[in-house]
């Protein structure tokens, strides 16, 4: 008789995805971030659900309701800080996951990669709308500045902004709809993650050598299920250290002041995980140009499969590409730092140089490095 997990229609799907899935025998800890992202999403959905039971999406009471959660709800402070820092953790894992994909050439699984880019946009939209909900100073002004960027779109721009606002400024209608979207989007993200996995399991996982691994596969369970579990435990240790000891380290002090449309904060900036894109936006002294650069800073990821010139998939044995990759990582860290600085010399020129370098490495230097390496290896 066949075992139930192999015959039952529902369990069969779980079995094929998480138990009997043939996986390469040599995938490293960089492959743990996919499962960690799943854990992050579950943390966010669960903490978000409990927060929504006590939160009110009204401009008069939103800020007070968040204070009430922290002061009066049993373990409300813990749920709130888990949710706020869970977003940061989500993006840390997300950026590591994308970096792994770039380094090891995983982007050559085009469908999986493109669904991943859509997922990135959805997560960014969700995080942005979530940041508006506490209705602090940075919530209000961040929402005003970022939504206002759409007014740079020719002809329909200003109408589009008013349509998103639901009025003539960021107000009650905006807060209400942002709450609705912020609640529904994580479930759409979960569904898209399933599609992401579906496409991945069509091809099987890549591996650090970037070579076909069909000749040497091992079952996902128990090998990688326990490896993922260890990753989750390390993640939790890191997560709860931040939540319990440094809960406000990644937040903005301005968001502890209630939103005031009559008082502009000296430096309007988004959360740390958007600062690199914000720096690219600010480095162009033209509104429409900045918005285009902002969109391209993420959309440029879609070009990776087209710009792959090397005859090897992974960067494991490609030293020139490795140097380019780590310069790109350093450049992103510099952009993140610049995004949090005021718009004044020398930060302006550093931001512009870092933005040019960002696009140059991806569009020009990495493909050239691939061609040089082919030549050196006489391929």
UniProtKB/Swiss-Prot annotation:
<feature type="transmembrane region" description="Helical">
    <location>
        <begin position="320"/>
        <end position="340"/>
    </location>
</feature>
<dbReference type="GO" id="GO:0045275">
    <property type="term" value="C:respiratory chain complex III"/>
</dbReference>
<dbReference type="GO" id="GO:0008121">
    <property type="term" value="F:ubiquinol-cytochrome-c reductase activity"/>
</dbReference>
<dbReference type="GO" id="GO:0005743">
    <property type="term" value="C:mitochondrial inner membrane"/>
</dbReference>
<keyword id="KW-0479">Metal-binding</keyword>
<keyword id="KW-0813">Transport</keyword>
<keyword id="KW-0999">Mitochondrion inner membrane</keyword>
<dbReference type="Pfam" id="PF00033">
    <property type="entry name" value="Cytochrome_B"/>
</dbReference>
<feature type="binding site" description="axial binding residue">
    <location>
        <position position="83"/>
    </location>
    <ligand>
        <name>heme b b562</name>
    </ligand>
</feature>
<dbReference type="InterPro" id="IPR016174">
    <property type="entry name" value="Di-haem_cyt_TM"/>
</dbReference>
<dbReference type="InterPro" id="IPR005797">
    <property type="entry name" value="Cyt_b/b6_N"/>
</dbReference>
<keyword id="KW-0408">Iron</keyword>
<dbReference type="InterPro" id="IPR030689">
    <property type="entry name" value="Cytochrome_b"/>
</dbReference>
<dbReference type="GO" id="GO:0046872">
    <property type="term" value="F:metal ion binding"/>
</dbReference>
<protein>
    <recommendedName>
        <fullName>Cytochrome b</fullName>
    </recommendedName>
</protein>
<keyword id="KW-0830">Ubiquinone</keyword>
<feature type="transmembrane region" description="Helical">
    <location>
        <begin position="178"/>
        <end position="198"/>
    </location>
</feature>
<dbReference type="InterPro" id="IPR027387">
    <property type="entry name" value="Cytb/b6-like_sf"/>
</dbReference>
<dbReference type="InterPro" id="IPR048260">
    <property type="entry name" value="Cytochrome_b_C_euk/bac"/>
</dbReference>
<dbReference type="GO" id="GO:0006122">
    <property type="term" value="P:mitochondrial electron transport, ubiquinol to cytochrome c"/>
</dbReference>
<comment type="subunit">
    <text>The cytochrome bc1 complex contains 11 subunits: 3 respiratory subunits (MT-CYB, CYC1 and UQCRFS1), 2 core proteins (UQCRC1 and UQCRC2) and 6 low-molecular weight proteins (UQCRH/QCR6, UQCRB/QCR7, UQCRQ/QCR8, UQCR10/QCR9, UQCR11/QCR10 and a cleavage product of UQCRFS1). This cytochrome bc1 complex then forms a dimer.</text>
</comment>
<keyword id="KW-0249">Electron transport</keyword>
<feature type="transmembrane region" description="Helical">
    <location>
        <begin position="77"/>
        <end position="98"/>
    </location>
</feature>
<keyword id="KW-1133">Transmembrane helix</keyword>
<feature type="transmembrane region" description="Helical">
    <location>
        <begin position="33"/>
        <end position="53"/>
    </location>
</feature>
<keyword id="KW-0812">Transmembrane</keyword>
<keyword id="KW-0349">Heme</keyword>
<feature type="transmembrane region" description="Helical">
    <location>
        <begin position="347"/>
        <end position="367"/>
    </location>
</feature>
<keyword id="KW-0496">Mitochondrion</keyword>
<comment type="function">
    <text>Component of the ubiquinol-cytochrome c reductase complex (complex III or cytochrome b-c1 complex) that is part of the mitochondrial respiratory chain. The b-c1 complex mediates electron transfer from ubiquinol to cytochrome c. Contributes to the generation of a proton gradient across the mitochondrial membrane that is then used for ATP synthesis.</text>
</comment>
<keyword id="KW-0472">Membrane</keyword>
<comment type="similarity">
    <text>Belongs to the cytochrome b family.</text>
</comment>
<feature type="transmembrane region" description="Helical">
    <location>
        <begin position="288"/>
        <end position="308"/>
    </location>
</feature>
<dbReference type="Pfam" id="PF00032">
    <property type="entry name" value="Cytochrom_B_C"/>
</dbReference>
<feature type="binding site">
    <location>
        <position position="201"/>
    </location>
    <ligand>
        <name>a ubiquinone</name>
    </ligand>
</feature>
<feature type="transmembrane region" description="Helical">
    <location>
        <begin position="113"/>
        <end position="133"/>
    </location>
</feature>
<dbReference type="InterPro" id="IPR048259">
    <property type="entry name" value="Cytochrome_b_N_euk/bac"/>
</dbReference>
<dbReference type="InterPro" id="IPR036150">
    <property type="entry name" value="Cyt_b/b6_C_sf"/>
</dbReference>
<feature type="binding site" description="axial binding residue">
    <location>
        <position position="182"/>
    </location>
    <ligand>
        <name>heme b b562</name>
    </ligand>
</feature>
<dbReference type="InterPro" id="IPR005798">
    <property type="entry name" value="Cyt_b/b6_C"/>
</dbReference>
<feature type="binding site" description="axial binding residue">
    <location>
        <position position="97"/>
    </location>
    <ligand>
        <name>heme b b566</name>
    </ligand>
</feature>
<keyword id="KW-0679">Respiratory chain</keyword>
